[in-house]
Amino acid sequence: QTVMLRHSHRFSGPIGELALAVNAGKPDLARACFAGDSGGQLAWSVPAQQEDVLRLALRGRADAPGGYQPYLALVHAGEAAYAQHDDWVRAVLHAFESFRILCAVREGEWGVAGLNTAIELRLEKDGLIRRSEWYVGRPVMVTRNDYGTGVFNGDIGLTLRDPARP
């Protein structure tokens, strides 16, 4: 089964306002996005060590618990509780979208690559994933536009089991 992304939500709401401020090079406006986010969708965190980020990824914040655990719980519970496979897929995607760690740089211990690796290793250590190249629940990011399918650079999807192949 193929699931197609039809609408990008990457730059809407508070995260969209933050992205515009950052891309425009307006740090004061970016900081104001955090102060003005009454829905609690954004949180500013300056961790002292990488372990703090790993705890955040596993459990979320005190005022917004969860981290990646709710999404992974849905992945592992499977679709049995849902009338349709597509309903389960939407629930998993929604749960995944409810938590993000954004990095200012790509490389290094504090960059996207370093934190993604550290988070995956911790999730595996805690039994939340079975890490391999294509483990169930693995996030994937599109790295170039494909106008034919409507999938664009930066869009995110998840690897899930094919219901036709249990």
Describe these PLM feature segments.
Residues F152-P163:
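Short beta-strand-centered aromatic/proline hotspots
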Residues Q1-V140, D146-G148:
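Conserved helicase motor core of P-loop NTPases
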